[in-house]
From Swiss-Prot:
The lineage of its organism: Bacteria, Pseudomonadati, Pseudomonadota, Gammaproteobacteria, Methylococcales. It comes from Methylococcus capsulatus (strain ATCC 33009 / NCIMB 11132 / Bath). Gene3D superfamilies: ArgJ beta chain, C-terminal domain (3.10.20.340), L-amino peptidase D-ALA esterase/amidase (3.60.70.12). The active site is at residue 193. Belongs to the ArgJ family. NCBIfam families: ArgJ (TIGR00120), PRK05388.1 (NF003802). This is Arginine biosynthesis bifunctional protein ArgJ. The record marks 119-120 as: Involved in the stabilization of negative charge on the oxyanion by the formation of the oxyanion hole. It is an enzyme of class 2 (transferase).
Length: 408
């Protein structure tokens, strides 16, 4: 996808090491030879860990195991790319647990303190022997400076690594939040193919950390879509090593909002990076829904527009077929929507006013906007004060090619 003036080169972002968090990678040749595809993350003893997972009923075996192990104060994360270990039944569960046992044997810990994550092709058994063989190298590579290699090791159809970092001060003491993510297709997270791993040195309890993560995910990863498909393997993990000299962040304290804002910003940047790297994407689309009755309603309207194949192909063709956007708003399910109060813009051009084509709108003005690499669709429902933002991309011929050829 072509870069815009606002599109920073995310590959150039340098992530800050997090004291107490070490990462190591290795090549297991799961799908590609000579490329790191196994990631091991170690959290110092006493770290807190929060996570959210896919809501897909056919969740992958590692998701089931990771959910169980999250309750055991996990210390290690094991991630592999190239194989999703989804749709693999009881053997898949056994393989996921065996991979945790392999890590435990290597580090001298407990298997139920290892959380497994996988991403890649669905329906194929995990190459457990390859992963076992790669683990010693990943363990030897563990380093607080391992973020760059980690960001690349978790990639599948991604064209570039996704990284984000924020530095804040709490009571005059520095706190860092660093994160990586992967995802380019099968992207319609509902945490509920997308993985994100974020770490901080903040001092914060696991319960509050979970609340912060859930709020941040709902405003970021749950507001993006590339193709409307929710992966079997989606997961987002937030780790806190407790190593900062800043005071403990406690519920109700003035420090919670500052920390929440930092996590929000990191996840929002990672979410945007995923959309910008959408499979075959040529355009980045923001959808802003305003004057809705509730934030949920605004998000629903935004997602309905973003999911529409007709809307997405119109963006790819630079075709200002605004009727497709209007139809998406109408079928979003807003109860008792007064269409005479609805207005729609493409960037600065108003295309719909009072529920009908704007009198000053021309096809030429619409085409001018639709040819841009970044476009904002703004919808005013005229029925409240709530708003939401959803991010998506166009649907191109390359998207069809990439996914048609994914296994061939």
């Amino acid at each position: 996808m072509a870069a815009s003036p606002e599109d920073r080169n995310l590959s150039d972002i340098r992530l800050c090491p997090i004291a107490g968090i070490r990462l190591g990678t290795a090549a297991a040749a799961i799908k590609h030879v000579g490329r790191d595809d196994v990631l091991l993350i170690e959290m110092a003893e006493g770290s807190a860990c929060a996570a959210v997972f896919t809501q897909n009923a056919f969740c992958a075996a590692p998701v089931t195991v990771a959910r169980e192990h999250l309750r055991q104060a996990p210390r290690w994360l094991l991630v592999n790319s190239g194989n999703a270990n989804a749709g693999t039944g009881t053997r898949g569960l056994a393989d996921a647990r065996a991979s945790c046992e392999a890590v435990a044997a290597l580090v001298g810990g407990r298997a139920d303190r290892v959380m497994p994550f996988s991403t890649g092709v669905i329906g194929e058994y995990l190459p457990l022997d390859k992963i076992r063989a790669a683990l010693p190298k990943a363990f030897e590579a563990l380093s607080e400076d391992g973020w760059e290699a980690a960001a690349r090791a978790i990639m599948t159809t991604d064209t570039r690594p996704k990284k984000a970092v924020r530095r804040i001060e709490i009571a005059g003491r520095p706190v860092v939040v660093s994160g990586i993510a992967k995802g380019a297709g099968m992207i319609h997270p509902n945490m509920a193919t997308m993985l994100a791993f974020v770490a901080t040195d903040a001092r914060i309890g696991a319960g509050l950390l979970q609340s912060v993560l859930e709020r941040a995910v709902n405003r970021s990863f749950n507001c993006i879509t590339v193709d409307g498909d929710t992966s079997t393997n989606d997961a987002c993990v937030l780790m806190a090593s407790q190593r900062s000299e800043a005071p403990l962040i406690e519920p109700g304290s003035a420090h919670v909002e500052a920390f929440q804002s930092a996590v929000d910003a990191v996840l929002a940047e990672l979410a945007e990076a995923i959309v910008r790297d959408g499979e075959g994407a040529t355009k980045f689309i923001r959808i802003l829904v305003e004057e809705a009755a509730s934030e949920d309603e605004a998000r629903l309207v935004g997602k309905t527009i973003a999911h529409s194949p007709l809307v997405k192909t119109a963006f790819f063709a630079s075709d200002p077929n605004w009727g497709r956007i209007l139809a998406a708003v109408g079928r979003a399910g807003c109860k008792d929507l007064d269409i005479s109060r609805v207005a729609i813009w493409l960037d600065e051009v108003r295309i719909v006013a009072a529920g009908a084509r704007d009198r000053e709108y021309t096809e030429a003005r619409g085409i001018t906007v639709m040819r841009r690499p970044e476009i904002t669709v703004r919808v005013s429902l005229g029925r409240g004060q709530a708003s939401a933002r959803v991010m998506t991309c166009d649907l191109s011929l390359d998207y069809v090619r990439i996914n048609a050829e994914y296994r061939t």
